[in-house]
Amino acid sequence: MLIHEDNRYIVEKEYNLVTEPQNASLFTTGNGYMGVRGSLEEFGSTRIQGSFIRGFVDEIIEVIEPFCDNEYMKKYYFDEEKLKKFDKQISCINLVDFLLIRFRIGDEIFYPWEGEILSWERRLDTSQSIFQRSVTWKDKMGNITVFEFERFASYDEEHRYCMRAMAKPQNHFLPVEIISGIDTDVRTGGQRVLQFINNQILNNGLISCFQSGKRYGITCKIAVKNSFFMDGKLQHSIGEQQENLLLNKALMPGGGREYCVEKTIYLTTDRDCDPLFDTIDTVLLDVGTYDAYKEAHIREWSQFFSNFDIKILGDDRKDAQLRFATYHAVITGDRNNSIHSLSAKGLTGERYNQFVWWDCEIYQLPIFIHAFPEVAKHALIYRYDRLEEARENAKLEGCKGARYPFVSSLEGKEHVWIYARHPFLQVHITADIGFGIINYFINTLDYEFMELYGFEMLYEICRYWVSKVILKDGTYQLLGVTGTDEHHPYVDNDAYTNYIVQYVLQETILLDSQYSSTKVRDKIGITVNELKDIEQVSRLLYLPLEKSGLIPQFDGYFDLSRDLEVDGSGTGKNFQMKQAGLYHKSQVIKQPDVMLLFSYLNFEIKNSRYEENWDYYEKMCESSSSLTFPVHAICSADANRMLSFLNYFNETVNIDLLDIHHCAWQGVHAGCLSGAWYAIFRGLMGIVTRIDCIQINPKLIPFWQGVELSFIYQTKKIKATLNGNVFTLGSEDKKEISVYFQGKRYAFVDRLEVSF
């Protein structure tokens, strides 16, 4: 079990083979461009080792052998004809293992499963984004050596990864050999995918050039510079190849106090549009030192992370857990380009294939929109770069405009697993992207982005919905869809889908009237009549709402049983189902649908009853998706149920630390972890940003002394502080902003304090 120290460290105190796969995910180091799992330097075990570059993907064989053991799986979940045809899938590709560092002490190579471990500690320093390990090891002959390892993915130079490893003899004078290099024998999905072009081996450096696979053939180059030291003096080294290992080695005599290797790795691909790809061999001549690179990295990381860091006062454990969650949320974001976007596992594992889902715009984008908008902008430009393929998707469906795939990768066509029925019905993804664009603009007023990218996407998204809806009983309806709750496919008028579509249509018309230019309209030929059609559909789209104020998740939802009939052996548990349930007969849902409207989307729904809906749907949700927990935390805060808020917040920050869903080894739950930040911002502090004001509704939380965070609203950086029943906003920017609190408007310039 991992522990917390000094509000910044996540620490492992013993070597445990059982938790090694899970902790490899948790100890990932990354910088948005690359992610490197926390595997051991001396040996990268299969399914534990993993190094990834954002957008470095190709095709793999994916073996899957599910079977249907109840009516629900047979008729509603699997398409068994397509299951027979499925064998290939796009996936992120595991790079060569460049972490390889081994120490030979006398005749014994250090491995933690050999000899005796006298002490062991691995720690992730979230304040510096550095991963460290310290081991005291006794070999079979009783020789004791202390090993210290340190590594980080540079925030100063995103293509650089730095490592340092040291051996310190304690009771012997044995010679020490350090072996540092690259292990090319790696697998993705259990198979060898990389296509090697060439390798170069020098006395103090290595270069490996390979391609992602046979479909895309993305070329990657990795250069490694090794410098070996004995008591601070540079040592001679040689280069050699041993089967799959590309190595630099230095054999040093006994009697030294400290033996060290400093290892600098540069990674680049031909998709990066970076001159490093053509000049990578020159990095072996680099005279930069590990300490200099470390100092520059810490400086850049500290500045970057300070935008996101929330301080919880009076609860050090929760403060550390939140900082860990925020760390993983933000290392998924690329600050420099839009080659790829925010994926569900970030760059911490192979599972979910580095695909981009609706999680991106709804769960992951808010932390960046409010704290570092440039990353959010890159994520949305990623969507724009796939607009043409989204147009083709709409045509294939017989619709106009653009339909975005439920799952995307390098391409904008659908990449979801073909044997599952529901993803092809989850058309809400197209509205989710529209919502993300609008949310970004509300908080940034980035007119240039809208002119170059945003409006064109919004117009095409609206065109899709206008052609998608069906006129029935005097209203426009959306039939045969799946909402966010994947347990219920083939439903009519899903609440989440209809409400978010209506919002995107309505807001697009509003933004068009206030901000759009004829240049964008002319580019895609949007006409006045089309704008009228968009307005009409937004006005007449059916929005589910009962007279009681309850919102049915879809047509006929309340007619289903509130119990879940169980039938079968439970093969569905591998597909995020807690039981072998006949979900099509039950109101039991996988994750929030209706409650997203009130929490993440912040819709003010006339005549609805928020608390009654929350009371109902909380009980119907089996929480088999991690995305449940931050939503439920916010809803609990809105209902002034602060103990419930704390419990759901605990599940949000601990989803992977405590391995709540028993799959942390596959990679962290980036959407849920991003929700930890948003649960404080939106839930506890009650901050909702509108285009013309900030609304606040802070909550008294008796378990903590206070909370502090910073956010950006329309270029104004604001510090928010919650201390008991006093809430304060402060800013050095003199721009005036309207703030609404308890029905009263305040003019906020540099400081605003309210009591509640």
From Swiss-Prot:
UniProt cross-references to SUPFAM superfamilies, sorted A to Z: Galactose mutarotase-like, Six-hairpin glycosidases
Superkingdom of origin organism: Bacteria
Cellular component GO terms, alphabetical: cytoplasm
pH effects: Optimum pH is 6.5.
List of residues binding substrate: W358, D359, K590, Q591
GO terms of biological process kind: carbohydrate metabolic process
Catalytic residues identified in the record: E486
An example molecular function term from Gene Ontology annotations: carbohydrate binding
Catalytic activity, reaction form: 3-O-alpha-D-glucosyl-L-rhamnose + phosphate = beta-D-glucose 1-phosphate + L-rhamnopyranose
Record EC number: 2.4.1.282
Keyword Transferase in record: yes
Cell compartment(s), UniProt: Cytoplasm
InterPro entries (alphabetical): 6-hairpin_glycosidase_sf, 6hp_glycosidase-like_sf, Gal_mutarotase_sf_dom, Glyco_hydro_65_M, Glyco_hydro_65_N, Glyco_hydro_65_N_sf, Malt_Pase/Glycosyl_Hdrlase
Assigned keywords, A-Z: Cytoplasm, Glycosyltransferase, Transferase
Function as written in the Swiss-Prot or TrEMBL entry: Phosphorylase showing strict alpha-1,3-regioselectivity and producing 3-O-alpha-D-glucopyranosyl-L-rhamnopyranose. Specific for L-rhamnose as acceptor and beta-D-glucose 1-phosphate as donor. Does not phosphorylate alpha,alpha-trehalose, kojibiose, nigerose, or maltose.
Complexes and interactors: Monomer.
Family in the record: Belongs to the glycosyl hydrolase 65 family.
This protein's name: 3-O-alpha-D-glucosyl-L-rhamnose phosphorylase
Organism classification: Bacteria, Bacillati, Bacillota, Clostridia, Lachnospirales
